[in-house]
Amino acid sequence: MPSKQRTLVEIACKASADTLSTHLPLTYTPLLSTTSYSITLVPGPSLSSTLKSTIWKLYEANMRTLSEGSSMGWGPKEKQRELWHSDSRFVLLRPLRQQGDKGKGKAREGSRGGAEVAAFAMFRFDWEECMDPDWEADNCEVVYCYELQVAPSARRLGMGKFLVDQLILLAREYRMRKVMLTCLKVNTSALAFYKCQGFAIDPISPSQLARSAPSAAGGETLDGETEWEDEAECDYEILSKRVM
């Protein structure tokens, strides 16, 4: 891997939450809402147990059924290790107590003392395999979005788009080539959303690999096209958006 790539990702990974936060706005107020939301960037290991519980409940409510029916399956322990990993970073949107708190970024506490989370994105700075025709190296620098979840009560307010915009902003600030993510094919609403945000199926996505290269298990279809069986049957896509 070229030393320049390694240096860029290492610099980004070493950036503190405070440093990363300087690139983000303090608050977000949706056009169709009177509620303002604080924007907090927190490393996975630094999340309080209360916030971890809140984030997990939101993730489980949104994704358990989809995951159980997929090849990825439902594995809470493995997923929690991924979420709270030392390289994980969270961008949290949390309701402010009142408009007067707007500049202070104080998030409203839930009725049981737990911090309310309207939406979150979890990402890492990383290297990923790159098969772009205009890219010579085998890997490139990316912001990989592992999760983007919005609470049901906060949907249709533009929060998903806002979070994607923040990931793109951070990717550009730290000179990452792409923002990338994995999306289940059955999650058609998410696929449509990311398409609207300018994402496309990446060349390393299983469906693209199936079109480009045969495997030992594959062969020719009736119309003479090669087929990579394992990849073609995969139930997810890898999406990306170029930012550099």
Q: Would you name each region that the model predicts?
A:
Residues 151-165, 174, 185-192, 196:
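Conserved glycine-rich acetyl-CoA-binding loop
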Residues 227-244:
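C-terminal helix/juxtamembrane-tail motif
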Residues 181-191, 207-216:
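Conserved beta-strand-loop-alpha-helix junction that forms the acyl-donor binding cleft
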Residues 172-182:
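Conserved GNAT acetyl-CoA-binding A-motif
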Residues 10, 45-52, 56-153, 164, ...:
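Acetyl-CoA-dependent GNAT
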Residues 195-205:
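Conserved acetyl-CoA-binding loop of GNAT-fold acetyltransferases
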Residues 207-231:
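Short proline/glycine-enriched turn/loop segments at secondary-structure junctions
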Residues 1-53:
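Conserved N-terminal entry element of GNAT/NAT acetyltransferase domains
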